[in-house]
């Protein structure tokens, strides 16, 4: 996305472009080439910001998951080049489709949204006792940052949503490490939900992930027929064999 503080149809002198990529991390050389291209076209390189969502379910972009014993990197050179090309393409597409908008920001604590997102150690009902606002700091010292920051851009004339941006500190690793499926993890699911609800485009920027703020094993509660949040107490087989699947759910505390 691109944000410019200039009036519409004027020369852009105050602007920045921000690209976020659904991968575990990126080295600077992935976008230095893009910066050089933009400099050649008269744009300031320091106005380009590139971040990674730290997604653990994407192809390896750092070399973390190869075969270190045999000195084999997990990175695919062809895929890495594709990322560089995609960063440039994303900026150009955003620049070609800029719209006058009004920005609004909001922040909340995830722990304040529901006691079912927080474990018993913090006064909630989540089955993971250490959970706080859908997060668990799995290393000492245990410090949880459960703040959710959002920014939304709405069209200045129609009010329609152009962009919804989220900023939260949960590691995108809820898919675990025992599969070869490629996805954007919870970031991808969140993006789909936000775009279906608000319209426009949804983008996620990671907060202070640290060492570490983990969303792993943070099951979401289900919603029963009465609209109450509950966690299931039985297996998928139990549910499929039951005449009333809601019998498998815990009563509201």
Predicted regions and their residues:
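Conserved beta-alpha junction segments in alpha/beta enzyme cores
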Residues: 1-253
């Amino acid at each position: 996305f691109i944000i410019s503080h200039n009036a519409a149809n004027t020369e852009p002198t105050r602007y920045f472009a921000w690209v976020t990529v659904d991968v575990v991390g990126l080295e600077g050389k992935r976008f230095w080439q893009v910066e050089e291209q933009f400099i050649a076209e008269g744009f300031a390189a320091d106005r380009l910001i590139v971040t990674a969502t730290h997604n653990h379910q994407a192809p390896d972009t750092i070399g973390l998951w190869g075969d270190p014993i045999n000195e084999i990197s997990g990175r695919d050179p062809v895929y890495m080049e594709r990322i560089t090309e995609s960063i440039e393409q994303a900026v150009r597409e955003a620049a070609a489709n800029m719209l006058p908008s009004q920005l609004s920001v909001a922040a909340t604590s995830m722990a304040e949204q529901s006691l079912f997102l927080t474990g018993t150690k913090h006064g909630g009902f989540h089955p993971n006792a250490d959970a706080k606002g859908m997060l668990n700091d799995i290393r000492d010292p245990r410090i949880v940052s459960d703040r959710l920051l959002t920014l939304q851009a709405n069209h200045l004339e129609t009010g329609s949503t152009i962009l919804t941006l989220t900023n939260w500190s949960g590691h995108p690793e809820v898919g675990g490490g025992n599969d070869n499926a490629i996805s954007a993890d919870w970031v991808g699911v969140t993006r789909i939900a936000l775009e279906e609800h608000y319209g426009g485009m949804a983008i996620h920027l990671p907060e202070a992930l640290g060492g570490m703020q983990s969303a792993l094993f943070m099951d979401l509660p289900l919603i029963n027929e009465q609209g109450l949040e509950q966690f299931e107490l039985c297996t998928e087989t139990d549910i499929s064999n039951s005449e009333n699947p809601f019998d498998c759910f815990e009563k509201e505390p």
